[in-house]
């Protein structure tokens, strides 16, 4: 199963087919052409998918079709962004706002900003993976990506996630580069993550 976007092959579960479970067959529609049942543990590996309408791509595997995957990263097991970074409604100075666990008002992510942030964190994960980042560092970036994915829909405190997971530090370590004017900046740093940008190559 592949859910888009995903942080790496550690978020691609490969299922074992079992068509003999009477309990499971009783749940599925007998008229369905194809149907797959999964449990919450499998959904968790799908970059934090839940059962409220998330979609995945099903790829049948055989001797000619082989999908590479890895075991889930330890730091992602049991992590639920909707619990870790939830917010609540509160009336402050006559206005209804969202506050985090510390009671501090937070700004909720818009749909457009979510797309931008997903691009940023996806590029970061790509650059880190290609640079051979440690599993613990990848866990931080992927945890933040899981928060960003659900931030708009579930009104999560993505700013706190950015701090807790040290995203600025990871950007500096894996994406710091100098442009042709000698100015340093962070952002997509490899050919894969910069594929949609115009890159100037200095003459030698």
Name what the model sees in each region.
Residues 53, 63, 69-204:
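C-terminal catalytic or substrate-handling cores of phosphate/nucleotide-
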Residues 1-59, 63-76, 191-204:
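Core mixed alpha/beta domains of very large multi-subunit molecular machines
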């Amino acid at each position: 199963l592949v859910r888009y976007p995903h942080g790496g092959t550690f978020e691609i579960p490969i299922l074992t087919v079992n068509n003999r479970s009477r309990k499971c067959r009783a749940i599925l529609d007998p008229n369905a052409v194809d149907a797959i049942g999964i449990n919450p543990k499998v959904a968790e590996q799908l970059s934090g998918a839940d059962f409220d309408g998330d979609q995945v791509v099903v790829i049948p595997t055989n001797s000619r079709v082989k999908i590479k995957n890895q075991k889930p990263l330890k730091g992602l097991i049991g992590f639920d962004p909707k619990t870790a970074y939830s917010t609540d409604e509160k009336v402050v100075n006559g206005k209804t706002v969202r506050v985090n666990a510390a009671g501090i008002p937070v700004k909720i992510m818009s749909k457009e900003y979510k797309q931008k942030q997903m691009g940023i964190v996806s590029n970061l994960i790509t650059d880190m993976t290609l640079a051979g980042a440690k599993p613990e560092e990848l866990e931080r970036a992927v945890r933040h990506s899981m928060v960003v994915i659900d931030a708009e829909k579930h009104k999560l405190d993505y700013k706190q996630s950015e701090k807790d997971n040290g995203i600025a530090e990871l950007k500096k370590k894996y994406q710091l580069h100098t442009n042709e004017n000698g100015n340093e900046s962070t952002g997509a740093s490899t050919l894969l993550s910069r594929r949609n940008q115009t890159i100037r190559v200095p003459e030698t």
